[in-house]
Amino acid sequence: MNQEKDQELVQHLAKQGVDVKMVMGHPASLFVLFFTEMWERFSYYGMRALLTVFLITEISKQGWGWSNQDAMELYAWYTGLVYLTPLIGGMIADKLTGYRKAILLGALIMTLGHASMALEGTSQSFFYVGLVLMILGNGLFKPNISSMVGQLYPDTSAKKDAGYTIFYMGINSGAFLGMLLCGYIGE
């Protein structure tokens, strides 16, 4: 019975044009998505852990010396827009680009956002451009990578729930490690 279900999964993957290699009874592509999302969440939560610390740190200590209120206001806007833009990013993928292209474009835009923020020392505008790029990239990336997990399995597959569990373990691992390590390094 299990071999029949595995064969059904392999046939589904082949029909989707996805590599049919299996790892621990799941499509190997699941683990690519696992690590991709893990590092994206590491990046997001790591940067969030450092954002307000950087903004309120005194200028003499390489920060911007903002008040707590101003730093939290920017943080609130950033976080709110990060959660709003996936609605638009999902529609863009559905109507224009497809999931894969949206994920790749989102990842590229977020990478440019991190690079821009790294140049903050040359001009403060790089910091703001970086935040905007991070928001826009997240909007394209976040809703679509989860959709790709669902496409790996037939609707009737009993392994679909387990696949999402594995995927969400990557999300939670990245978030935990990002806050822990980046917060520690930032201090």
Model feature map: region roles:
Residues A49-M72:
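Short amphipathic helix-loop junctions that connect adjacent transmembrane helices
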